[in-house]
Amino acid sequence: VEMNHDVRTVRMVGKPLPKTVRPWLGDSLGHWEGDTLVVRTTGFHLQQNLRAAIKHQFYMTEDSVVEERFTRTSKGELLYQFSVTDESIYTQTWRGEMTLRSSEGPIYEYACHEGNYAIKNILAGARQEEKE
């Protein structure tokens, strides 16, 4: 799942990182349950307590546990499910899900720079390539 410039490593083997190591987006461990990739993330960086990835803000602490499930439901669809558990700030686990659909054509890297002054030429080149 892409969100701006965030990059998260999901390790498929190993143990959780020591508590002294706090990656900005947490420590993600994944495993397969049949055809579903399950990712459990803990150990969020203390300054990463406010998320706005789904148009709503929610708080996270160093005790937060996020479980994500990625299941291919058809050739072009992926069911994304998540749950957030943190007894220090929430009275119960809360959940959400959405269907992610593949797009036609290439997916370009999300990269920008101050002013984005080159975007006009980048888009012009892409439109020319489409015409050819």
Language model: regions and residue ranges:
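Hydrophobic small-molecule pocket/channel-lining residues, especially in calycin-type beta-barrels
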Residues: 1-132
